[in-house]
Amino acid sequence: MSQFTHINASGEANMVDVSAKAETVREARAEAFVHMAPETLQLIVSGQHHKGDVFATARIAGIQAAKKTWDLIPLCHPLLLSKVEVQLQAIEAENKVRIESVCKLAGKTGVEMEALTAASVAALTIYDMCKAVQKDMVIGPVRLLEKTGGKSGHFKVEA
């Protein structure tokens, strides 16, 4: 089993030293879901939501969040992201929104946390914009779908 990289021999949390690592192209994809009532989803899809374009706002929030991950999660490194993409899809047959994020860079550490943060904050933004209409929406699951690059190699969720 692998060891935790953020904990030293004394059990104290520290930011990992990546200064000796080689720069490689790294990419990560994550997804999140927001489950809601059909009426709430219809407000979003039809563009009739009183707060405006829910998907556009959630997309921008997710992108901004990816860029601020280092500021939100204490042991994450500040990264020079080269790409952040957030896609939102209404799945009307299941009364949910699927959010997929992609983050990419050429660097010394991975972008999994940035992708997860982007998807999570986009989901939270949908909740925030729709909570006046429905308070019992459910966010989840949120998960890493795939990551490439770096020493640990390629990871992909099995279908």
From Swiss-Prot:
Pathway given for this chain reads:
Cofactor biosynthesis; molybdopterin biosynthesis
- Superkingdom: Bacteria
Query: What InterPro entries does the record point to?
Result: MoaC, MoaC_bact/euk, MoaC_sf, MoCo_biosynth_MoaA/MoaC, Mopterin_CF_biosynth-C_dom
**Keywords, sorted A to Z:** Lyase, Molybdenum cofactor biosynthesis
**Enzyme class, broadest EC rank:** lyase
User: For this protein, what reaction is catalysed?
Assistant: (8S)-3',8-cyclo-7,8-dihydroguanosine 5'-triphosphate = cyclic pyranopterin phosphate + diphosphate
- Name the EC number(s): 4.6.1.17
Q: Which residues form the active site?
A: 128
* One Pfam family linked to the record: MoaC
Functionally, this protein is described as follows: Catalyzes the conversion of (8S)-3',8-cyclo-7,8-dihydroguanosine 5'-triphosphate to cyclic pyranopterin monophosphate (cPMP).
Q: Give the multimer and partner information.
A: Homohexamer; trimer of dimers.
Protein's recorded name: Cyclic pyranopterin monophosphate synthase
Which organism is the protein's source? Vibrio vulnificus (strain CMCP6)
